[in-house]
C-alpha cells in the first residue's frame, strides 16, 4: 500500500510551503480511509511518494479518477496567509491504497 501526493509545480511554492501543503494533503486523505486500510498502510511504513503536475486542471482530473475508483483522496486549497492567493489549489493526495491502484492513476507523473 502507498499514497501519492501530487503538487502543482507551476505555482513554484517555496520548500516550506510545499512541505506544509503535502502534509495537509496526506493527513486529509488518510482521514478518508477506512480503519482497516489505514492500519495496513501505517503497519507497512506509511509509504508515500511526491509527484508533480503542472496545472489545477490535472489535479482535478486525478481527483475524478480516484473518485471513480473509490480511492481515498483529498484536494488541498491554500488559506492564502503567505505565498498564495486564498483558495489556490496546491496539491492532491491519493490513497493510501494498493500500489497497483495508485500507479494506475499516477504512473505517468514525474517525481517532484
Curated annotation (Swiss-Prot):
Any Gene Ontology CC annotation: cytosol
Keyword Cytoplasm: yes
Cellular localization per UniProt: Cytoplasm
Pfam families: PTH2
Enzyme Commission number(s) of this protein: 3.1.1.29
Transmembrane segments: none
SUPFAM superfamilies tied to this protein: Peptidyl-tRNA hydrolase II
Enzyme class: hydrolase
A Gene Ontology BP annotation from the UniProt entry: translation
Keywords in alphabetical order: Cytoplasm, Hydrolase
Entry keyword ATP-binding: no
GO molecular function terms listed in the Swiss-Prot or TrEMBL record: peptidyl-tRNA hydrolase activity
Main location: cytoplasm
Reactions it catalyzes: an N-acyl-L-alpha-aminoacyl-tRNA + H2O = an N-acyl-L-amino acid + a tRNA + H(+)
Described function: The natural substrate for this enzyme may be peptidyl-tRNAs which drop off the ribosome during protein synthesis.
HAMAP family xref list: Pept_tRNA_hydro_arch
Family under the similarity heading: Belongs to the PTH2 family.
Stored NCBIfam families: arch_pth2, PRK04322.1
Name assigned to this protein: Peptidyl-tRNA hydrolase
Gene source species: Haloquadratum walsbyi (strain DSM 16790 / HBSQ001)
Amino acid at each position: 500500500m502507498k499514497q501519492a501526493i501530487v503538487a502543482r509545480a507551476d505555482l513554484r511554492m517555496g520548500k516550506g510551503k510545499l512541505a506544509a501543503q503535502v502534509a495537509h494533503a496526506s493527513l486529509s486523505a488518510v482521514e478518508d480511509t477506512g480503519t482497516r486500510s489505514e492500519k495496513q498502510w501505517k503497519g507497512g511504513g506509511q509509504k508515500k511518494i511526491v509527484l508533480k503536475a503542472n496545472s489545477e486542471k490535472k489535479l482535478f482530473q486525478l481527483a475524478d479518477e480516484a473518485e471513480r475508483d473509490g480511492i481515498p483522496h483529498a484536494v488541498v486549497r491554500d488559506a492564502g496567509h503567505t505565498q498564495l492567493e486564498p483558495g489556490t489549489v496546491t496539491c492532491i493526495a491519493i490513497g493510501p491504497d494498493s500500489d497497483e491502484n495508485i500507479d494506475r492513476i499516477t504512473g505517468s507523473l514525474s517525481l517532484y
